[in-house]
Amino acid sequence: MSKRDYYEVLGVGRDASEREIKKAYKRLAMKYHPDRNPGDKEAEASFKEVKEAYEILTDTDKKAAYDQFGHAGVDPNRGGGGFGGGGDFGDIFGDVFGDIFGGGRRGGQRQAARGSDLRYNLELSLEEAVRGLTKELKVPTLVGCDSCDGSGAKKGSSATTCGTCHGMGQVQMRQGFFAVQQTCPTCHGRGKIIKDPCSKCHGNGRVEKTKTLSVKIPAGVDTGDRIRLAGEGEAGEFGAPPGDLYVQVTVREHPIFVRDGNNLYCEVPISFAKAALGGEIEVPTLDGKVSLKIPAETQTGRMFRLRGKGVKSVRSHAVGDLLCKVVMETPVNLSERQKELLREFEASLTGESKKHSPKAEGFFDGVKKFFQDLNN
């Protein structure tokens, strides 16, 4: 199962305060704690997930790294910290609750953790998103160490079970009537001791590497779409399965078109004369220019639909439309002769406004009636 977003795990928004995060954590930790759900593996997994999310989102540096890079930004082996808990019921529970449930040692030996999922933010132009393409991505990640085959131990040696926690990665400390589960101080939660570590990975079993992946982006993707590449996340601990890579798509704003689902919108300026007399204009599409017939007496703001000139759906393969809104442009920088012609034209309409400008006439009739009603 893929590692979920930490904010989603705690049920809070990305702008949640630390107080809101702690409140959500306490509620969920009480709900899923294994002592309240004995033998329930799903509850146990949920508890670990909640604990991990809380550790990251209440640490300022880790939270900033996670917000920017996702799970890849908080890996313990990436040079400056990151999430370092092993994945069992670490000391965070003891810090917040003091193990109010008590209870004995649970489970068998700790299993190596699956690799973390990675997120890659990919920005595309509208043209790239509409047509689809193959992108080459360079992804910094952790891969299994080829020197020790991911074991962390020098060739010819092997890891041994930790004698302190007997392979569980956790130890139980009693404080009066209460028992507190804490990360084993000897193996640091791994459950195993590597006495002769690999010189290349220093006993981690994984090393940093930038992978180059060729990713096919399907035609029709849009902002918010996510492409999953199974097994292309970080290598798991000591031979455990790798995580997945999620390519998060963002489409840049376009200077001409606005996308809404599978439809495209654009505004096309037309002259006063073209709007009044009609004619043909050229409008842009993603496939080039096309001719659009404008009928006489077209009003500004009228929408024209060009069917099949939109975006092909990435799911249904249906093709949307291009909707062109014509906007009448008022002429500027007129010569005296041009202004004179417009005055003559305006004068020729005097007394015939109902015929030539019915909307304006109706509007002013309504205004006149409004003020008459006020005075009565």
From Swiss-Prot:
<comment type="function">
    <text>Participates actively in the response to hyperosmotic and heat shock by preventing the aggregation of stress-denatured proteins and by disaggregating proteins, also in an autonomous, DnaK-independent fashion. Unfolded proteins bind initially to DnaJ; upon interaction with the DnaJ-bound protein, DnaK hydrolyzes its bound ATP, resulting in the formation of a stable complex. GrpE releases ADP from DnaK; ATP binding to DnaK triggers the release of the substrate protein, thus completing the reaction cycle.</text>
</comment>
<feature type="binding site">
    <location>
        <position position="201"/>
    </location>
    <ligand>
        <name>Zn(2+) 1</name>
    </ligand>
</feature>
<keyword id="KW-0235">DNA replication</keyword>
<dbReference type="GO" id="GO:0005524">
    <property type="term" value="F:ATP binding"/>
</dbReference>
<dbReference type="GO" id="GO:0042026">
    <property type="term" value="P:protein refolding"/>
</dbReference>
<dbReference type="Pfam" id="PF00226">
    <property type="entry name" value="DnaJ"/>
</dbReference>
<feature type="binding site">
    <location>
        <position position="198"/>
    </location>
    <ligand>
        <name>Zn(2+) 1</name>
    </ligand>
</feature>
<feature type="zinc finger region" description="CR-type">
    <location>
        <begin position="132"/>
        <end position="210"/>
    </location>
</feature>
<comment type="similarity">
    <text>Belongs to the DnaJ family.</text>
</comment>
<dbReference type="GO" id="GO:0009408">
    <property type="term" value="P:response to heat"/>
</dbReference>
<feature type="repeat" description="CXXCXGXG motif">
    <location>
        <begin position="198"/>
        <end position="205"/>
    </location>
</feature>
<keyword id="KW-0479">Metal-binding</keyword>
<keyword id="KW-0677">Repeat</keyword>
<dbReference type="InterPro" id="IPR002939">
    <property type="entry name" value="DnaJ_C"/>
</dbReference>
<feature type="binding site">
    <location>
        <position position="184"/>
    </location>
    <ligand>
        <name>Zn(2+) 2</name>
    </ligand>
</feature>
<dbReference type="InterPro" id="IPR036410">
    <property type="entry name" value="HSP_DnaJ_Cys-rich_dom_sf"/>
</dbReference>
<dbReference type="InterPro" id="IPR018253">
    <property type="entry name" value="DnaJ_domain_CS"/>
</dbReference>
<dbReference type="GO" id="GO:0006260">
    <property type="term" value="P:DNA replication"/>
</dbReference>
<dbReference type="GO" id="GO:0051082">
    <property type="term" value="F:unfolded protein binding"/>
</dbReference>
<feature type="binding site">
    <location>
        <position position="145"/>
    </location>
    <ligand>
        <name>Zn(2+) 1</name>
    </ligand>
</feature>
<feature type="binding site">
    <location>
        <position position="148"/>
    </location>
    <ligand>
        <name>Zn(2+) 1</name>
    </ligand>
</feature>
<feature type="repeat" description="CXXCXGXG motif">
    <location>
        <begin position="162"/>
        <end position="169"/>
    </location>
</feature>
<feature type="binding site">
    <location>
        <position position="187"/>
    </location>
    <ligand>
        <name>Zn(2+) 2</name>
    </ligand>
</feature>
<dbReference type="InterPro" id="IPR036869">
    <property type="entry name" value="J_dom_sf"/>
</dbReference>
<feature type="repeat" description="CXXCXGXG motif">
    <location>
        <begin position="145"/>
        <end position="152"/>
    </location>
</feature>
<keyword id="KW-0346">Stress response</keyword>
<dbReference type="Pfam" id="PF00684">
    <property type="entry name" value="DnaJ_CXXCXGXG"/>
</dbReference>
<dbReference type="GO" id="GO:0051085">
    <property type="term" value="P:chaperone cofactor-dependent protein refolding"/>
</dbReference>
<dbReference type="Pfam" id="PF01556">
    <property type="entry name" value="DnaJ_C"/>
</dbReference>
<dbReference type="InterPro" id="IPR001623">
    <property type="entry name" value="DnaJ_domain"/>
</dbReference>
<dbReference type="InterPro" id="IPR001305">
    <property type="entry name" value="HSP_DnaJ_Cys-rich_dom"/>
</dbReference>
<feature type="repeat" description="CXXCXGXG motif">
    <location>
        <begin position="184"/>
        <end position="191"/>
    </location>
</feature>
<dbReference type="GO" id="GO:0005737">
    <property type="term" value="C:cytoplasm"/>
</dbReference>
<feature type="domain" description="J">
    <location>
        <begin position="5"/>
        <end position="70"/>
    </location>
</feature>
<feature type="binding site">
    <location>
        <position position="165"/>
    </location>
    <ligand>
        <name>Zn(2+) 2</name>
    </ligand>
</feature>
<dbReference type="InterPro" id="IPR012724">
    <property type="entry name" value="DnaJ"/>
</dbReference>
<keyword id="KW-0143">Chaperone</keyword>
<dbReference type="GO" id="GO:0008270">
    <property type="term" value="F:zinc ion binding"/>
</dbReference>
<protein>
    <recommendedName>
        <fullName>Chaperone protein DnaJ</fullName>
    </recommendedName>
</protein>
<keyword id="KW-0963">Cytoplasm</keyword>
<dbReference type="GO" id="GO:0031072">
    <property type="term" value="F:heat shock protein binding"/>
</dbReference>
<keyword id="KW-0862">Zinc</keyword>
